[in-house]
Amino acid sequence: MWKCNDKIARLNAERFRDMNLKTGLTPAILSYEGLQYQHIAPQVFTEKELTYIQEHLCILSGFYGVLKPFDGVTPYRLEMGTKLETEGCKDLYEFWGDKLYQEVIKDDGIVINLASKEYSQSISKYILPKERFITVEFGEVHNGKVKQKGTFSKMARGEMVRYMAENQIEDIEKIKEFHVMGLQYAEEFSNENKMVFTV
């Protein structure tokens, strides 16, 4: 189930065994340690920036579903793409069905997608024509095509969340002004459902 070494597998088996979903919880935005979250750097956010992400950011989780930044979580390891059969479901996508989509889309019908494909497909396949699901991609141009690299994309996603919080972005067009890590908006590779930034 976990693609990891024995030490990490034992740690997470113990976490699930001893899990308490009601006490000792940590805000979700401070709990995740991946590159994307390191580049969001919520520890240095102002109160105004923290309020912004609480109102605008949704965190997708294979275990919890949709989290807001200050929702309390306990340590766990369960990727959305995990082949975990549950009663009547062959994997977590089938288990969650359209519940994540319903939660994310409920406010205004516009989603700026900064999730990896593994997570975003739990929402994108349910999007209706009247709704906007805009995927943001980061990469380098090679032979007229944009090539994405996993590590760089994770860092850039986190930087964009931070940029949006720092600048209190409410207008989609303002996202195009993102100029971090040498990235610039690439209109020639973008369309109404995709914003592409290249170096």
Locations of the language-model features?
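A broad, low-specificity signal marking well-ordered, structured residues that form hydrophobic/aromatic
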Residues: 35, 134, 195
